[in-house]
A protein has these predicted regions:
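Structural beta-sheet core signal
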Residues: 8, 48, 86, 106, ...
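Switch II (G3) loop of P-loop NTPases
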Residues: 27-36, 197-203
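Short beta-strand-centered segment that lines the nucleotide-binding/catalytic pocket of NTP-utilizing
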Residues: 4-16
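Glycine-centered, small-residue-biased loops immediately flanking beta-strands
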Residues: 82, 250, 305
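Conserved small/polar residues in nucleotide/adenosyl-binding loops
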Residues: 316-317
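Conserved motor-coupling elements within RecA-like helicase/translocase cores
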Residues: 22-25
Length: 317
């Protein structure tokens, strides 16, 4: 936007550039960081955005408080003339922000945030739009080409950062309207027998809930979710949260856990998640192979349904 020419290094494949790395010709360097193994503590940003803080990577961190402590250390890396843009909806956000040397700017759906969203709406294909409010004053209307309240929050954080950098609002409108997401983030894959197939990388309960909530704004009769949990550690530690998040949709199909870097020593399984969902009255199934899952959905999914394949996924998926 606004003829900026940043260098980019992000985790997902950006559809706009067909990759996750871009070498620009300006002083702007935009990097997507991760807290796993405290890798983000090796960065020294001038402007940083914290979107959320959740219990994750519990094979490395002891608990949520341990994760929050790392985010506090990350925030402390910002210099006095730096800016931290942070989601106001993070619980006890002051624990992260109080006493920092840098300036703190908040965003969220509550009007008390420095940058907030009002009158959120969704069009016939689920794409979001909202009024951007800054310190109680309307900056303008923002229309996105992606769906879900989580993307409204993502956009707000980008708007705050762009405003701090002096980028005009009209350029933000153009840039965010042209942004069509990344691969494996509510990615439309096509149709089969009249039902729509969406693929999503969500493998944490918070991400799952956000994706399934976004699906409710997408045209559909019923939503089917195929979920493959990622790592035994995460599945064991967040078992109840997975059940709660998955219970928000119409039908759930569980594939075997993708072990990734781990071995099965914790006695947790996808079948247990399916049984827990059934006890909550949910329509849930565990199927032991992707071949059986394919047969099942081709038999059950109807015209007008939406099928979401979800998870970090294994090689054979």
């Amino acid at each position: 936007a606004d003829d900026q020419d940043p260098t980019l290094s992000v985790g997902g494949i950006l559809k706009a550039i067909g990759g996750n790395i871009r070498v620009g010709d300006s002083e702007l360097f935009v990097a997507e960081a991760c807290e796993y193994t405290n890798s983000f503590l090796h960065l020294f940003p001038k402007l940083a955005i914290i979107l959320n803080i959740d219990a994750d990577h519990l094979d490395f961190f002891k608990d949520l408080q341990d994760i929050r402590n790392s985010f506090r250390k990350f925030a402390e890396l910002l210099p006095e003339d730096g800016v931290l843009v942070i989601n106001q909806q993070i619980p006890n956000v002051e624990e992260i922000t109080d006493g920092l040397a840098c300036k703190v700017v908040t965003f969220g759906t509550d009007p008390s945030a420095d940058y907030s969203a009002a009158d959120i709406a969704h069009d016939e294909v689920g794409d979001s739009s909202f009024d951007v409010m800054h310190d109680g004053q309307k900056m303008g209307r923002m229309a996105l080409s992606v769906t879900g309240e989580h993307n409204v929050l993502n956009a707000l954080s980008a708007i705050a950062a762009a405003d701090i950098l002096g980028i005009p609002f009209v350029s933000m409108q153009k840039g965010l309207k042209e942004f069509r997401g990344t691969n494996r983030r509510f990615e439309y894959k096509g149709t089969k027998n009249g039902f729509t197939i969406i693929d999503d990388y969500a493998h944490h309960p918070t991400e799952i809930r956000a994706t399934l909530t976004a699906a409710e704004n997408y045209p559909h009769k019923e939503v089917w979710c195929i979920f493959q949990p990622h790592t035994y550690t995460r599945t064991k530690a967040l078992f109840d949260e997975f059940v709660d998040a998955l219970s928000t949709t119409d039908h759930v199909i569980l594939a075997d856990i993708y072990a990734a870097r781990e071995t099965d020593t914790l006695g947790v399984s996808s079948e247990q998640i399916a049984e827990a969902l059934k006890k909550k009255g949910c329509d849930a199934y565990y199927l032991p192979s992707f071949e059986k899952i394919e047969e099942f959905v081709l038999e059950r999914c109807q015209k007008g349904d939406v099928l979401i394949t979800m998870g970090a996924r294994s090689e054979e998926r």
